[in-house]
UniProtKB/Swiss-Prot annotation:
<keyword id="KW-1015">Disulfide bond</keyword>
<feature type="signal peptide">
    <location>
        <begin position="1"/>
        <end position="26"/>
    </location>
</feature>
<dbReference type="GO" id="GO:0090729">
    <property type="term" value="F:toxin activity"/>
</dbReference>
<dbReference type="GO" id="GO:0005576">
    <property type="term" value="C:extracellular region"/>
</dbReference>
<keyword id="KW-0800">Toxin</keyword>
<protein>
    <recommendedName>
        <fullName>U-scoloptoxin(10)-Cw3a</fullName>
    </recommendedName>
</protein>
<keyword id="KW-0732">Signal</keyword>
<comment type="similarity">
    <text>Belongs to the scoloptoxin-10 family.</text>
</comment>
<keyword id="KW-0964">Secreted</keyword>
Amino acid sequence: MRAIFAIFVIFFVVLHTDLIMTGILADVIYTEKEIAACGRNCKHLPNSRCNVANRKCCPVPQLFSNCPKGGRVK
């Protein structure tokens, strides 16, 4: 009985960990695609870069202040 229970617990832990890791990897891949799209869109604006924190094109001096005004969403 203990062996069956142990196999079940191991199977559950491995499956659960795999699902969690898959979700984390999906978030990372999706975020990288968003950042890449934002960077491509910002190339068309003069003196602008993509702010990774909020995915907006910001004038270079405002880049790290989250574009309080004038930020253009991707």
